[in-house]
A protein has these predicted regions:
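A short Gly-Trp-Pro
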Residues: 2-135
Length: 135
């Protein structure tokens, strides 16, 4: 799906989704409908439908965006250096279609409140970049 034209994506996505997924914008914090979602299921790429994250790896980071301590697997996302905004960050993209999802930070939980081990990672993902499928 990485070879799809921008015209294809403009027709498929809403205006906000296009800005975030294709132009690397960031949605307003605390505005996304999936931020407080507590249901069990899978979070998929809004653009192509590829599974990216699961509810059992989601946690409340207090940042205003859905946060996950790991992806569904190592092949579902691509990581790359992002030097925009005068700082170096790690961009998270869908491995299947190349759409921008958010950023990866090293300030995630080492230990979860329920006793599970975390990864120390925080995948900070735009809510509008995700489509949730309930289990």
């Amino acid at each position: 799906m990485k070879n799809k034209s921008e015209d294809f994506w403009k027709k498929k996505l809403t205006g906000e989704q296009y800005k975030v997924l294709r132009e690397k914008a960031t949605e307003t914090p605390f505005s996304g409908e999936l931020l407080n979602n507590k249901e069990k299921g899978v979070y998929k790429c809004m653009a192509c439908g590829s599974p990216l994250f699961t509810s059992d790896k989601k946690y409340d980071s207090g940042t205003g965006w859905p946060s996950f301590w790991n992806a569904i697997d190592d092949e579902s996302v691509e990581l790359s250096e992002d030097n925009s905004l005068g700082m170096t960050r790690v961009e998270v993209k869908c491995a299947n279609c190349g759409s921008h999802l958010g950023h990866l930070f090293d300030d995630g939980p080492e230990k979860m409140t329920d006793g599970r081990n975390g990864t120390g990672k925080r995948f900070c993902i735009n809510s509008c970049a995700l489509n949730f499928t309930k289990k």
